[in-house]
């Protein structure tokens, strides 16, 4: 039984996913939870090893992997070919292409201004650029863009506005444009990092405000976007910031109180939750990769981004496998995430 044969059957999407999951080993399920960065501009032996040995659920590319459109097309085609040869379910192929300060290969791809600049222009401009950029990324072989930013007033011009309603309007329009271009997209960084005071790439940042304040400001954006966006077209990316008035012990990406109790139960989001990069200092300075991977899945995350070091991805995988074997991560909890991931993949890849 292959992904393709099940995907093309007459079953409902949920039945297809149930059938796939019923025939997966624990190891194959765990691998769906990992999306990793690779090194090099070609599919070198190390990258092939990671695909064949660890059979991950997705790959994310950075400037280190990209030098020209033709080269990127070839690399992604080779990744997909290697994945298919290894018998993998189709891979998420991701990129961070927000525009402005966060843009890859910006000398050769459509130049998208910072969100702050777009937020001051007519919304049609933001929508048009997102459609053009999305179509370009799709043509290169990407299927998910980790954008748009849904935070309020973030530094480096990454936010559309400090006004929650304006961020909803612009981020929602941009997300819809990516979907129409054939890409999945991601609203980030739940529950909002506009009030952080430390770069999370460097270390932990504490957001010392109440849940009520977040609900009327930063998190209101995510709630409104979830209400208006089509299921399985997007993910919610959770931040590594700490919100001590909600959970004094864990950053958001490791917090059951924030992901399961708040985002899933209270807000009602049933889709895929992806972490921000676990190689960032906000987590990597304080946890082992095995521990953070296990804690994040127990908290309610589905996909763990490990973007830079193969060793860290291996530690995360080994930690997850140990937790599945000793029962800390139950079969039911593991299957929940895998089903969400496969249902999302099934929505665009047959």
Residue ranges of model-derived segments:
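N-terminal hydrophobic targeting/anchoring segments and the immediately downstream early-domain regions
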Residues: 2-91, 97-104
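Second-shell residues forming the walls of enzyme active-site clefts
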Residues: 25, 67-84, 91, 162, ...
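Active-site mouth loops of central-metabolism enzymes
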Residues: 33-43, 115-128, 203-217, 279-287
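Active-site beta-loop-alpha junctions enriched in small/polar residues
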Residues: 39-41, 64, 96-100, 149-151, ...
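Short, acidic/polar
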Residues: 39-52, 125-136, 216-224, 287-295
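Divalent metal-dependent hydrolysis catalytic cores, especially in the metallo-beta-lactamase
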Residues: 57-62, 142-149, 300, 304
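Glycine-rich, aromatic-flanked loop segments that form ligand/cofactor-binding clefts
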Residues: 80-110, 129-149, 175-192
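A substrate-binding/cap region within the structured catalytic cores of diverse enzymes
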Residues: 115-171, 175, 179
């Amino acid at each position: 039984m292959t992904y393709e044969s099940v995907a093309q059957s007459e079953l409902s999407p949920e039945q297809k996913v149930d059938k796939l999951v019923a025939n997966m080993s624990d190891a194959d399920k765990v691998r769906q939870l990992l999306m990793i960065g690779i090194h090099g501009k070609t599919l070198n032996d190390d990258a092939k090893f990671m695909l064949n040995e660890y059979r991950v659920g997705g790959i994310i590319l950075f400037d280190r992997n990209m030098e020209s459109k033709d080269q990127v097309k070839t690399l992604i085609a080779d990744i997909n070919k290697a994945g298919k040869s290894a018998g993998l379910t189709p891979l998420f192929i991701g990129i961070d292409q927000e525009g402005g300060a966060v843009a890859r290969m910006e000398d050769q791809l459509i130049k998208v201004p910072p969100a702050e600049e777009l937020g001051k222009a007519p919304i049609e401009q933001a929508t048009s650029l997102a459609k053009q950029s999305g179509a370009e990324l799709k043509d290169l072989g990407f299927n998910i863009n980790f954008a748009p930013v849904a935070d309020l007033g973030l530094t480096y011009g990454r936010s559309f506005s400090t006004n929650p309603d304006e961020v909803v309007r612009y981020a929602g329009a941009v997300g819809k444009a990516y979907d129409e271009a054939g890409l999945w997209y991601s609203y980030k960084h739940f529950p909002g990092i506009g009030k952080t005071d430390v770069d999370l790439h460097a270390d932990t940042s504490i957001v010392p405000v109440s849940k009520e304040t977040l609900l009327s400001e930063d998190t209101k954006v995510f709630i409104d976007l979830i209400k208006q966006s089509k299921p399985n077209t997007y993910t919610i990316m959770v931040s590594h910031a700490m919100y001590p008035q909600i959970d004094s012990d864990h950053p958001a990406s490791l917090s059951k109180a924030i992901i399961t109790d708040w985002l899933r139960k209270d807000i009602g989001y049933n889709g895929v939750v992806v972490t921000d990069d676990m190689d960032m200092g906000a987590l990597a300075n304080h946890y082992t990769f095995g521990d953070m991977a296990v804690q994040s899945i127990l908290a309610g995350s589905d996909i763990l981004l490990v973007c830079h070091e193969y060793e860290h991805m291996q530690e995360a995988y080994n930690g997850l496998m140990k937790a599945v074997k000793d029962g800390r991560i139950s079969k039911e909890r593991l299957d929940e995430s895998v089903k969400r991931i496969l249902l999302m993949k099934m929505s665009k890849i047959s």
